[in-house]
Amino acid sequence: MGRNKFLIFVTVFMTTTISATDLTVKQLQEMTARFAPVDLRVDTSKLSAGDRAALVKLIEASRVIDHIFLQQVWTGNLALEAKLRQDTSALGKARLEYFWLNRGPWSDLDEHKAFVPGVPERKPEGAAFYPEDLTRAQFEAWVKTLSKTGLGEAEGFFTVIRRDKVRGFKAVPYSEVYGTDLVKCAALLREAAKLTDNKTLRRFLETRASAFLSNDYYESDVAWMDLDAPIDITIGPYETYNDELFGYKAGYESYVNIRDDAETAKLKFFGDHMQEVEDNLPMDARHRNPKIGGLSPIRVVNEVITSGDGAHGVQTAAYNLPNDERVVHEKGSKRVMLKNVQEAKFRMTLTPISKLVLAPAALPSLSFDSFFTHILAHEMSHGIGPHQIRVSGRDTTVRQELKDLYSAIEEAKADVLGLFMLQFLQDRGYIKHDETQLYTTYLASSFRTLRFGLNEAHGKGMALQFSYMVNKGAFVYRNGLWNVELGKVRGAVRDLAHDLLTVEATGDHAGAKKMLDTLSVMRPDVAETLKRVAHVPVDIRPVFVTATELAPELR
């Protein structure tokens, strides 16, 4: 169902005039430097002895996932990695470092162009899930000849397509293609299952180990939804982004995390007050939901190690899984938020951006706690406000009525309602927060998101909010720097929340379009500001210190 990498709009580094053969050590180092190295340390002292021993096995299993994913990206990846490792020259070392950052010889930030000679100029659209010369037309013609079962296998998450002398093509299960690695990974999961004290973790690890060998992930996806343990692990084939041909095939990834109990308690507190917030939303009372449904679970964790599809390029900051529609229908989905990753992004990207865009007097009010609390409130806000609505006498949904505009409007709504919620809880005396920190951090964070550009839902939604705040006098631009007008920002937040909620509640596609056409624009003052932050690192490059200390890596 997706992941949030806080991907941001950046200038493409590699132009068509520079070939992989011509890239120098300095150029490769500059490309790598777009990712700021940062140590990730996690406190494991509160884990039981059994869980601590299990954690070591899970770190080792995570590294096996990397080996599988390299094979999924390109058939020549393992041989190329070995060749690069043997090249001890400065150029060879620079290529190897950037290879591991991208998990292959194509640069994620540069339209998947090659930075190593002797490989396809661009990453194959079908990765290694299909024959490299397969066309869409060939695949579509073949699947028309298949039975319902055969079609399910061909288009399924967990098979690769190979040529077959008799039938033209065939679907081969992951359990067969990556069998050696999956047997190794399953054994490590079973060892961890025996060591842990937690029943839900043990069940997930046992069922996921079986899934690696059977190629049937349903039972273990259900067990993952039920996982409630100090060690929070996600491991297996999930996202389909690397299948650019059809979006069918899932890449293996792993996130080994430690649950953050303090932030989890904060989420429960928010959840306990969601109905009260709903009852006071700034919109016509007839549109409020007198009984909001159960909210999808959200876990706040700290990442020990990630690998495979979750570890290349821009780092994942949150993910929402599983993708199996049967499981989603039965159990819903779960959102996992990686707090220490988000803190690292805040420190290495948002903080330096802020120093370039905020007025000096505003800088002391920049706060990670405000940043992360607003992110939590944003996620909770997706669960309140209009969802099922009635338009012209018929039952429908906000998504169906707003169509292509839904994502941008909903992202803007969640941002603004997150602010409204925190202010509401503060006014009721439920929480204490520093208003100046909240709104100053929101202003600074706007520029982090606006680096997405305006072709993506988060960027469109943020541009809408930003223009609205400027028009209301809540954000002020003086002498090339920005500040918050505290006397106006609260009212602006409430007014914008009202407008967005009303558009959603009435299914007003025309109204949504007018808002986006009018407000979701790249203002000249914003464009000028973004030019000044172009040199700030795009993202982070985690160094998994705790993982290495617990389970030293042998390469």
Where are these regions (language model features)?
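Bacterial N-terminal signal peptides
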Residues: 5-17
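Long, well-structured alpha-helical subdomains associated
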Residues: 419-514
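Fold-level signature of zinc-dependent metallopeptidase catalytic domains
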Residues: 28-57, 150-424, 428-446, 450, ...
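N-terminal secretory signal peptides that target proteins for export/translocation
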Residues: 1-3
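N-terminal helix-rich structural modules
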Residues: 22-196, 200-204
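Extended, compositionally biased alpha-helical segments that mediate assembly or anchoring
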Residues: 497, 501-555
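Short, hydrophobic/amphipathic alpha-helical patches that form generic packing surfaces
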Residues: 60-67, 97-104, 188-191, 207, ...
